[in-house]
Amino acid sequence: MEREKQWIVRVVWRVSERQISRWRGIVTYKIRNKQLPWEYRHHWQVQWQFWTYSQFIIPLSKDDYIEVNIYHNLTPERGWLSSHGVGLSYYHQKGYKTEVDPGTADRMIHLYYFNCFTDRAIQQAIRGEKYTWCTFKEGHKGQVQSLQLLALVAYTNGIRKRSKRTFTRMAGNLGSRQGAMGRMATRHAQGSKRRSQKALWNEHANPSMELLCRGGKET
């Protein structure tokens, strides 16, 4: 017996194809390099979900996960044939399901993935010791941030800027007279002049839901 087509209503963020390509590139890179245990499903692997372009499963624990559905050809009667959309859902194996917004999804992901400041980070920073940095700043958006967190972020950003200036100065001191090593270091510090200095993404970029849905319209 043929299964009857059923319609559902859900929250969808309209996004551009460029946003999807950028986010998917970051995620698939980290999946291939085993940095993230996320699951990527092609459209032909998703059954009975029409207009689903692809799907990502983000496990949070043994009992729950976030599901990211990327849709295409939205609302053809409005002429949105080339439009794409993103739906975010939270699932619990006991049967609970709800829609989540990008900010909430990022905070949930940050709890299970990516490093963050520890309780001892302030003391370690004051003593000049090494401490764990927050590598997923998107996970703190929308929160009322404490003075300790704001101080750590400002201090960490200062360290990164000083490190970048030091590396650029060292590379410049090598000069082009130092042979291939000097030329390579100078190019690395100054960036390529042949193409745009803005890369589409790099290996250190985060697969944030805000990155995927930013600029999209809630429909």
From Swiss-Prot:
Function: Counteracts the innate antiviral activity of APOBEC3G. Forms a complex with host APOBEC3G thus preventing the entry of this lethally hypermutating enzyme into progeny virions. Functions as an adapter molecule, recruiting APOBEC3G to the ubiquitin-proteasome machinery. Targets APOBEC3G for degradation through the assembly with elongin BC complex, CUL5 and RBX1. Binds viral RNA and affects the stability of viral nucleoprotein core. May play a role in viral morphology.
Lineage: Viruses, Riboviria, Pararnavirae, Artverviricota, Revtraviricetes
Description of its domains: The BC-like-box motif mediates the interaction with elongin BC complex.
One matching Pfam family: Vif
Motif (HCCH motif): 110-140
Membrane topology: Peripheral membrane protein
The name this protein goes by in its record: Virion infectivity factor
Subcellular location: Host cytoplasm; Host cell membrane; Virion
